[in-house]
A protein has these predicted regions:
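Short amphipathic alpha-helices and their capping/turn segments at secondary-structure boundaries
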Residues: 1-2, 90-100, 152-159, 184-194, ...
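An N-terminally biased module of ancient metal coordination in phosphate/nucleic-acid-related enzymes
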Residues: 1-60
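Hydrophobic faces of well-ordered beta-strands that scaffold small-molecule active sites
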Residues: 3-7, 50-53, 77-80, 103-107, ...
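Catalytic metal-binding/acid-base residues of hydrolase active sites
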Residues: 8, 56, 147, 172, ...
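Short, acidic/polar
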Residues: 31-42, 86-97, 184-185
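Active-site gating/metal-coordination segments in enzymes
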Residues: 59-149, 156, 199-205, 212
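Short, electropositive alpha-helical surface patch
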Residues: 60-75, 158-167, 220-227, 251-263
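H/E-rich (His + Asp/Glu) clusters that bind or coordinate divalent metals
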Residues: 175-276
Length: 276
């Protein structure tokens, strides 16, 4: 079984609203990227399950990803967004989990920390404790989209909410030039492996790389992540459905799988099967 833990799907008006959800996020889609387009992509490439992730440009209304997961319950689960600055976000999180069937949420510390360094630490805000406890009470999963410099927030949250499963999105964006410093800027991310409730998505390697396949300048840090977290806590994810992959400068799904199978040749067959 192959599971893609990270694909964005969306609709546009009049089917679903569009609009930014966070500071420094202003992109607006001009065309849809549907669940059906993703299903065709999955079927053509042997992918069994996908986690649908609400985009940052689809407002706080998670209806499309929630409905898609309920429409195709044997192929999808949904991760939603909830506003970390909304005083009613605990009730909102409960609604999306209890009434609409989403299994988790995505937060973007990188979009907030650029303004007020303290106020921007959304995973550490006392005002969000009830929301995170609400998600924890429901065995929710939370994925964190951020840079390595914000790893301290996840370190705090993973300790404070040990019953939440936390996922690191896109490896927290390691940069190949860090290799000259023995990858030391990435040490705070690797240190998160001390938390048994933190997992890491091995994804977006190609966009960080300055080299063509097999993206050799990124393979050492992938190895370090695998060694730190262990094969039981690494996940595989991609980004967009169908032709939207190349439109957003991502490789096709077949190439994503080739990276996982051929470029990551340091993984055993069993380890690779576990990641996928």
């Amino acid at each position: 079984m192959i599971v893609d833990t990270h694909v964005h799907v969306w609709e546009i008006p009049p089917i679903a609203p569009v609009g930014p959800t966070a500071p420094r996020q202003s992109g607006i889609p001009q065309e849809s990227a549907t669940a059906e387009l993703l299903l065709a992509d999955m079927d053509a490439n042997g992918v069994d399950w996908t986690v649908l992730v609400q985009t940052s440009f689809s407002t706080w209304d998670n209806g499309y990803v929630a409905d898609s997961a309920q429409k195709y319950p044997d192929r999808f689960v949904a991760h939603a967004l909830v506003d970390p600055l909304d005083p009613d976000n605990a009730q909102t999180a409960a609604y999306w989990m209890d009434e609409r069937g989403v299994v988790g949420f995505r937060f973007h510390p990188m979009y907030y920390a650029v303004d007020d360094p303290e106020e921007g630490k959304i995973l550490m805000r006392p005002e969000n404790e009830i929301m995170f406890e609400t998600i924890s009470d429901r065995d929710g999963i939370i994925q964190i989209h951020s840079f390595a410099e914000h790893a301290d927030q996840l370190d705090y949250a993973a300790t404070r909410y040990p019953n939440v499963t936390w996922l690191i999105d896109h490896m927290m964006y390691p940069q190949p030039e860090w290799a000259s410093d023995n990858w030391s800027p990435y040490d705070p991310v690797l240190a998160l492996s001390r938390h048994p409730n933190v997992y890491i998505k091995i994804s977006d390697v190609h966009n960080r790389s300055k080299q063509n396949f097999p993206h050799s300048d990124m393979l050492d840090i992938v190895k370090k992540a695998v060694e730190a977290f262990g094969v039981d806590r690494i996940l595989w994810g991609t980004g967009y459905p169908g032709y939207h992959r190349t439109k957003h400068n991502w490789p096709p799904l077949a190439e994503e799988l080739r990276i996982a199978v051929e470029a990551f040749d340091f993984l055993s067959d069993e380890e690779r099967d576990n990641m996928l």
